Amino acid sequence: MRTVKINTSLSTHLASAAALFARNAYAVEQECTNASSEKLLTEHRSYCIGAVIASAAFLDASINELYLEAIDRNPQTFGVNHQRLARLMEHEWKTIESHPILEKYQRALGLGLKSPFPQGEHVYQAVDALVRLRNALVHYKPEWDTELKVHQHLEERLGTRFAHNPLADPNKAFIPYRCLGHGCAAWSVMTALEFYQKFTERLGLPSRTISDPAGLAVQ
């Protein structure tokens, strides 16, 4: 009779995927010329979209996995000094499960008697912008260039955070053209990793070890 149960996490694979997409976007930008084929430009855009979505998915999966590890009392995450936190996170899970990503992180900090991230802090603002960009791509709604709302707001939030796509016509729309370049892809990966690292340090839990042959390099 089988007595061993196996529980597989995905968050670290999502981080590796995001970094791979960013590296591939960088490689295409180094190769591209003004005469580059539409096929290459399509690949480049796909890598950038993948990096954004996978970076946000890493944050989403990581916090979900943490709550479920609390329920399971995973000893590698919740040692003897964190049993109170594990019990509180277990109790909170059904309430918080469907809430936005950042709310889950902030709530975990509160349960651990740690100060939540100030909403005006750079790292919080960056992740909020990343999640909003991910949502805009996943739940995409086109907007007329004379009636920009969500896309205009995103450009204002993101416009100076990274270099714009060097392969895009500067007169084209911010989303999906000027925004989605290696600058955006790399920023997405680094934003997600930095936030998660700061979160675990703040909460006093061990950070996840991400085994990646390229060391999560973004170019």
Task: Please report, for each region that a protein language model flagged, where it lies by residue.
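C-terminal/domain-terminus segments
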Residues: R2-S9, F78-G79, E147-N165, T200-Q219
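Short, hydrophobic, well-ordered secondary-structure elements
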Residues: H44-A70, V138
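Flexible secondary-structure boundary motifs
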Residues: I71-G159, A163-F174
